[in-house]
Amino acid sequence: MLQSVVFFALLTFASSVSAIYSNNTVSTTTTLAPSYSLVPQETTISYADDTTTFFVTSTVYSTSWFTSTSATITNAASSSLSTSSASGSVTPESTHEITSTSTITSTLLLTLHDSTTLSPSSTAASVSDEDSNNKDAKVKSFEQASTSNGCVPITKFVTVTNEPVTQYVTVTPNTTTQYVTVTGAPSVTTTSPGNVQWYNTTSITNSTSW
């Protein structure tokens, strides 16, 4: 009999404990309305040289989307449990996520001055019939391009050939002085008694200076 009472008491305690920790799940969907921010940023770049000046203006629009930082769930569900020994209530949990999305749109505006292009092509006037090897040459101008802001420089090349020139040079030598050295070696030869002949052995050295 005592064992039956103890078993019944344990069974009642176990059912009470299980009732305390039992719960239910309720699904709830909440739509969050996002907000956005539009931030324009303008940038201007300029270019200038001797004949041209223009500006490049660009505007970048940045759009940021933001979800709400808080959410309210109105249909909160609760579940009441009761047993012989305990009772409780269940409060559902809610979560939300914040998402930020940026959209960049670029607009490029390029403004240039109006320009007019001219492309003439003609033959240059012939040169005069003077002593020149190029008198029959045909010189054609390069294509030209000009704008309202200035002209484009044009380069022409002309080949000139010189006539051969002959020059005569007269060379007059300076007056020169020549010296002659005579060296004699006297000797006496007797051909016969009473006759004596004299003669010289002479060498001439000629030196010339300019």
Curated annotation (Swiss-Prot):
Signal peptide: 1-19
GO biological process, one term: nucleobase-containing compound metabolic process
Positions bearing carbohydrate: N23, N174, N200, N206
Compositional bias of kind Low complexity: 118-127
Basic and acidic residues bias: start-end ranges: 132-141
Keyword annotations: Cell wall, Cell wall biogenesis/degradation, Glycoprotein, Secreted, Signal
Cellular compartment(s): Secreted, Cell wall; Cell surface
Protein name: Cell wall protein SRL1
Lineage, top ranks: Eukaryota, Fungi, Dikarya, Ascomycota, Saccharomycotina
Gene: SRL1
